[in-house]
Swiss-Prot record:
Lineage, top ranks: Eukaryota, Fungi, Dikarya, Ascomycota, Saccharomycotina
Family of this protein: Belongs to the cAMP-dependent kinase regulatory chain family.
This protein's name: cAMP-dependent protein kinase regulatory subunit
Positions of 3',5'-cyclic AMP 2 binding: 288-404
GO BP: any one term: positive regulation of protein export from nucleus
């Protein structure tokens, strides 16, 4: 039987994912658990207890990996060099929390793995050998990979699927090509009331999105939750190669969309990897970011979003509340002030929007695109957390501050 420590830890992780909706779920999970591991070991050292006490005791099948960090770098050597630093957390709020399937459906309680304090199944076998344990994914080899279940969807199916997965946090950050690939790899499954969709303790094979109907979650034959249209379940077992933590049964007739394990992992990993590649040159060539380590750049790349503006579009307006920091990938912008007119012009690899975030002030100027301009944006919450030492450089260059 799995310990209370393990149950509460999983529940805390579920809630954390809900609250943060991380762009890179795999990296977030790795950072979250490695940080918890580091905290646990510090406490253990203070208590003169050697080592980390695994929730699986001497039967922990992951003990070897735990000694080297709970999760290894999914991206191999990658464009940023070595392994990811297990001591960093890519999302700041890890106060305990878990997985949430967004959309019309349920909250975090409605994922089968989001079981709160429900008991772990009796047949949750930590020593079970799963066939996916040797699944090594190399994102830089994805160009040669062809999904097994790819099938072009009809217009009617596409509309249904866009509605079903459009707000699901696992997919809403995918680029258009990756999202199209996901949609065309989904398999429609219609199940009758009473059908057992997944069984606790079994090996994870599919991730499911509920289009219509309601499903129930059971642990040790005890009902713990229900979930409806727009929700999803089955993700954790695929991500971490762990047995199913619950049995899921159709409470009504249901229409489900299923994504197989390999496609699920490759699309999500591949998307994050390509995003890092895309932003690598931009971040390395920006003088203000020279102080960032390769790992810090990787975390920053994962958090960036892309926006494109056409000539004449106002990107930020003087007096507005500042919510984002901007890095120009390509293009040109005019910076103007109401009383001063044109102040300066910006070009490739310049940045703007930092003053409002550094000083918690309204926007100090208006920035307008003068031709087609592509920018990478970083939200306010990630500004201090991810820019690290680069924030000090930004402060030194802050035009609103007096320097000696």
């Amino acid at each position: 039987m799995v310990s209370e420590e393990c149950r509460s830890g999983l529940a805390a992780f579920q809630t954390a994912v809900n609250e943060n909706s991380p762009d890179d779920f795999f990296q977030y999970g790795a950072n979250y658990f490695n940080k918890k591991l580091e905290e646990q070991r510090k406490l253990s050292r203070r208590s003169a207890v050697s080592g980390f006490k695994s929730p699986f005791a001497s039967s922990d099948p992951h003990a070897k990996e735990s000694d080297n960090g709970l999760f290894k770098n999914s991206f191999g050597s990658g464009p940023f060099g070595g392994n990811d630093d297990p001591k960093s957390n890519s999302n700041s709020n890890d106060s305990g929390n878990g997985m949430r399937s967004q959309g019309q459906g349920p909250t975090d309680r409605n994922s089968p793995e989001a079981l709160g304090n429900a008991p772990i199944p009796n047949n949750f076998n930590a020593l079970r050998r799963t066939s996916v344990s040797g699944e090594t994914l190399q994102p830089d080899h994805f160009d040669d990979w062809q999904p097994e279940h790819y099938k072009e969807k009809s217009e009617e199916q596409l509309k249904r699927l866009e509605k079903s997965i459009g707000k699901n946090f696992l997919f809403n950050k995918l680029d258009s090509d990756s999202k199209k690939l996901v949609i065309n790899c989904l398999e429609e499954k219609r199940v009758s009331k009473g059908t057992e969709i997944i069984k606790q303790g079994d090996e994870g094979d599919y991730f499911y999105v509920v289009e219509t109907g309601t499903v129930e979650f059971f642990v040790n034959n005890e009902k713990v939750n229900t979930s409806g249209a727009g929700s999803s379940f089955g993700e954790l077992a695929l991500m971490y190669n762990s047995p199913r933590a619950a049995t899921v049964v159709a409470q009504t007739d249901c229409t489900l969309w299923a994504l197989d394990r390999l496609t699920f992992r490759k699309i999500l990993l591949g998307s994050s990897f390509k995003k890092r590649l895309m932003y690598d040159d931009l971040l390395k060539n920006m003088e203000v970011l020279k102080s960032l380590s390769t790992y810090d750049r990787a975390k920053l790349a994962d958090a960036l979003d892309t926006k494109i503006y056409n000539a004449g579009d106002v990107i930020i307006r003087e007096g507005d509340r500042g919510e984002n920091f901007y890095l120009i990938e390509y293009g040109a912008c005019d910076v103007t002030k109401e009383k001063e007119g044109l102040v300066t012009q910006l070009k490739d690899h310049d940045y703007f929007g930092e003053v409002a975030l550094l000083n918690d002030l309204p926007r100090q100027a208006t920035v307008t695109a003068t031709k087609r301009t592509k920018v990478a944006t970083l939200g306010k919450s990630g500004f201090q957390r991810l820019l690290g030492p680069a924030v000090e450089v930004l402060k030194l260059n802050d035009p609103t501050r007096k320097h000696d």
